[in-house]
């Protein structure tokens, strides 16, 4: 194809059309024309290729927990369906922002796990696959079983994978322990040496746009009440031991003003001020080292649980707090 970014070109061309409905119609027509051209070129090139491999491209466009979830999905596909897998990471250079367009996301997978190998799709591969083999819904395992080529844009639930499978594929301790220093190293030692350490993750940031916030009826007061209830329930569960709570959050000022100020004086807690704010995987590693955990919403705390090796762990979450 003559032009590398037809989406951008089409948007520029249709912008001169004043009426939105007609502008959208023309955009769809031009996209259909470009897609047809890609298909024709692909068929010609594919027929001329002798050893071309079929593969699946997985779109990486998430925070760190989402990146890990998609990596594990890719490994599962390779192990169970004998497919080649590549990853499209172009989103991090094009946008890389959260839902509210405030927090910058980084592709940190290889910074955290330096011992894994992943194939990055080229811009040309991404453009072709996105236009010809794009799927954002359906049974992806069935698609992988029956399709030679796929571009997968979806968000796999990390809880759908077996904990032992994740720990087999990724060794977070081997990759991160030697990188701990200063405050992070002190916190790690305190967490692992305390007989009743409890990691508490409080998701903020784009929480109002996060679907999981619906469990709290999108209400900060209900959200705060849950945190207090979970803390005091954990204290009861761990008696006669006295737990120490280690708080992690992407908005610690909110936690200080809305949680710490209202905790009973007998609650022993500390907040975790990451030495490297951009490297969120250190928070995940520290959380995974605690004896017990309290979840709020999102995949971050769930993924930390996947790396936790305590066989007697107590986990409190919005799903189970009323049944414990």
Outline where the language-model segments fall.
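N-terminal pre-catalytic "stem/leader" segment of glycosyltransferase-like enzymes
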Residues: 38-90
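Donor-binding and catalytic core of enzymes assembling or modifying cell-surface/extracellular glycoconjugates
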Residues: 64, 238-321
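Boundary detector for helix-to-coil junctions that initiate low-complexity/charged tails
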Residues: 1-36
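Secretory-pathway luminal glycosyltransferase catalytic domains
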Residues: 39, 50, 54, 94-242
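Short, solvent-exposed loop/turn segments at secondary-structure junctions
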Residues: 62-65, 90-95, 156-160, 203-207, ...
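Short beta-strand segments
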Residues: 87-89, 199-202, 244-249
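Conserved alpha-helical elements of sugar-nucleotide-dependent glycosyltransferases
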Residues: 9, 66-69, 73, 226, ...
């Amino acid at each position: 194809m003559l032009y590398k970014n037809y989406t951008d070109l089409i948007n520029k061309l249709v912008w001169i059309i004043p009426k939105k409905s007609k502008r959208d119609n023309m955009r769809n027509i031009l996209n259909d024309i470009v897609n047809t051209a890609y298909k024709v070129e692909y068929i010609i090139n594919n027929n001329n290729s002798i050893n071309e491999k079929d593969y699946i491209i997985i779109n990486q466009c998430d925070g760190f927990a989402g990146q890990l979830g998609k990596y594990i999905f890719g490994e599962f596909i390779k192990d169970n369906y004998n497919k080649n897998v590549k990853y499209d990471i172009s989103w991090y250079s094009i946008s890389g922002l959260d839902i509210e367009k405030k927090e910058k996301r980084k592709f940190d997978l290889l910074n955290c796990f330096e011992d894994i190998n992943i194939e990055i799709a080229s811009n040309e591969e991404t453009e072709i696959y996105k236009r010809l083999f794009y799927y954002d819904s359906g049974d992806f395992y069935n698609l992988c079983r029956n399709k030679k080529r796929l571009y997968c844009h979806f968000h796999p639930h990390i809880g759908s994978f077996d904990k032992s499978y994740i720990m087999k594929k990724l060794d977070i301790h081997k990759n991160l322990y030697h990188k701990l220093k200063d405050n992070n190293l002190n916190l790690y030692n305190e967490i692992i040496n305390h007989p009743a350490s409890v990691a508490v993750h409080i998701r903020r940031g784009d929480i109002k746009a996060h679907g999981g916030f619906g469990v709290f009826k999108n209400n900060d007061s209900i959200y705060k009440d849950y945190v207090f209830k979970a803390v005091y329930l954990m204290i009861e569960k761990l008696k006669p031991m006295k737990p120490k709570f280690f708080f992690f959050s992407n908005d610690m000022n909110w936690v200080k003003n809305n949680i710490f100020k209202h905790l009973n004086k007998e609650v022993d807690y500390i907040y975790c001020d990451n030495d490297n704010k951009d490297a969120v995987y250190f928070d995940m590693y520290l959380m995974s080292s605690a004896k017990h955990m309290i979840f709020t919403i999102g995949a971050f705390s769930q993924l930390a649980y996947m790396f936790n090796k305590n066989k007697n762990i107590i986990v409190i979450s919005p799903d189970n707090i009323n049944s414990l």
